[in-house]
């Protein structure tokens, strides 16, 4: 399965999955149609599936236009988003399984950013060691999504599920927010050597106009404060230890950063 990262809008990424054997494609969170259609034309592939992580317009904005061109599309989304994702045909629950391009995927229900948010984890293919996590706006490289419809306790539970996945998991989040996220992370975890090194690398990447996505889940576990609510240094920094309170404090600080 080839994964094509397609820039969209101001800072979104759309991900197009290509099954070369069958010459079929699936798209994750199509914010707009043109990048998807251009990529499909280049590949000469047929679009068969949309995977939506949640209902926000910058993740489902192209659903209707793509359905107009490919009326037999299956549109996947969480069952809690029924009526909020245009054209949705498949209503997923936590633990559901699906497959694309001979890769098996598990659905994770991860409320917090929105009440119906889901993530898709594609386990490594045969003979491979790297998995792929499409997490929408739940985890960002160096950060996490705002809590529009959920609570800190929900987000701790949701991210807690995802951080149990292997370190050798590529994290395909939907926005290029990494540099700003790491600037904030350094204010709450300033002695973290891995974080300091990552910031320098990302700063150089962005100065050269390079994308920072995908990230690695192992990197997030070491450097992303929103996966480190149980780290003693971060707990000391915010003056509390209960996971939801630590997370809520971090999120509030980031909202005002």
Swiss-Prot record:
GO biological-process terms attached to the record: methylglyoxal catabolic process to D-lactate via S-lactoyl-glutathione
Recorded family membership: Belongs to the metallo-beta-lactamase superfamily. Glyoxalase II family.
Keyword rRNA processing: no
UniProt remark on cofactor binding: Binds 2 Zn(2+) ions per subunit.
Cofactor(s) the record lists: Zn(2+)
Swiss-Prot/TrEMBL catalytic activity: an S-(2-hydroxyacyl)glutathione + H2O = a 2-hydroxy carboxylate + glutathione + H(+)
CDD domains the UniProt entry points to: hydroxyacylglutathione_hydrolase_MBL-fold
Top-level taxon of the source organism: Bacteria
Signal peptide: none
EC numbers: 3.1.2.6
Protein name: Hydroxyacylglutathione hydrolase
NCBIfam families in the cross-refs: GSH_gloB
Short name of one Pfam family: Lactamase_B
Role description: Thiolesterase that catalyzes the hydrolysis of S-D-lactoyl-glutathione to form glutathione and D-lactic acid.
